[in-house]
Amino acid sequence: MEAAERKNELRKRTKEFAGSIIRFYMALDKKREELRVIGKQLIRSGTSVAANYREASRARSSDEFTAKIDLCSQEADESQLWLELLREECGISSEMIDPIWSEADQLIRIFVTMSKNTKRNHD
């Protein structure tokens, strides 16, 4: 797969991740205050992954690219935290959470590798 294809594939994948977060939030019972509050935090972090990846795609320098990719990783990690809290403290089923958590984990691994490779090639 060429670099442009990988870039477009990851762009699509991060957008799909954001969409899965939105659909997950829409399925929550917003009458429960804790679900509404944590769900909104999850929406912010989960959609931020896609937004920051798009910004990274348009970076003007290696340093800017690395900074945005690192933000993607951080936001995906934060999304995992909110998902864990929803499962462990709010009783949301693993069946609902695990696929999204796993995708966040895979994205984190990709972003960490991208960041390391960019830093190595830049030094």
Predicted region positions:
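Amphipathic alpha-helical assembly/interaction segments
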Residues: 1-123
